[in-house]
């Protein structure tokens, strides 16, 4: 694809991307919400989670279009789910789970993600990866998105379960 882009062959590139997109859709056509951007991120992350033997439970009630920028959707869902998957990897396979709840009412969007984890505490929410220079920026990015929408975010360690709860304000349904 990079070659086609550098060559400037946009029409062939569009065709190539269209075929690739069709193939991805055939692989996982799951709909988790009415929002195609959220679903795209969720399909990718849920697919990765299931490949790790993680049980997934979703309850998502958000509209097809809302006043939340696409990039912010990727940052919010992507980083939080990456962290949940990482925590689940450290747990025995039969205990691995991620629960995603998401709803939009009266201009407020609530996103709650719970996941299994070891009993170990990580009070500072710092990365546990050995290469902490390249990792650990996700929570900072998530906080920026939450602040952008005048929201709040809480991280709760419940022992062998971790919960992130984010509330964003001013998220209206687009017509």
Task: Please name every model-derived segment.
Residues 30, 56-77:
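Conserved short strand/loop->alpha-helix "switch" segment adjacent to the catalytic nucleotide/phosphoryl-transfer site
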Residues 93-107:
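Short beta-strand/loop element within the Bergerat-fold HATPase_c
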Residues 150-160:
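Glycine-rich ATP-binding loops of the HATPase_c
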Residues 119, 158-165, 171:
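Glycine-rich nucleotide-binding loop
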Residues 107-140, 175:
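Glycine-rich/acidic phosphate-handling loop/turn and adjacent ATP-lid/helix
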Residues 49, 85-93:
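A short, flexible helix-to-loop-to-beta junction within the catalytic ATP-binding CA
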Residues 18-22, 34-51:
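Short beta-to-alpha transition helix within the HATPase_c
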């Amino acid at each position: 694809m990079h070659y086609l882009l550098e060559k400037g062959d946009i029409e062939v590139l569009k065709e190539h991307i269209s075929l690739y997109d069709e193939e991805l859709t055939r692989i996982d056509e799951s709909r988790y919400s009415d929002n195609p951007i959220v679903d795209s991120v969720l399909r990718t992350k849920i697919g990765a989670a299931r490949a790790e033997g993680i049980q997934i439970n979703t309850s998502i009630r958000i509209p097809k279009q809302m006043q939340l920028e696409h990039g912010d959707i990727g940052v919010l869902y992507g980083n939080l789910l990456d962290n949940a998957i990482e925590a689940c990897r450290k747990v025995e396979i039969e205990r691995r789970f991620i629960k995603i709840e998401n709803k939009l009412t009266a201009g407020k969007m609530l996103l709650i993600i719970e996941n299994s984890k070891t009993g170990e505490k990580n009070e500072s929410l710092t990365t546990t990866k050995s290469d902490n220079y390249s990792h650990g920026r996700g929570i900072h990015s998530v906080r920026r998105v939450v602040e952008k929408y005048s929201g709040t975010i809480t991280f709760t360690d419940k022992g062998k379960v971790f919960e992130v709860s984010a509330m964003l304000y001013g998220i209206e349904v687009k017509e």
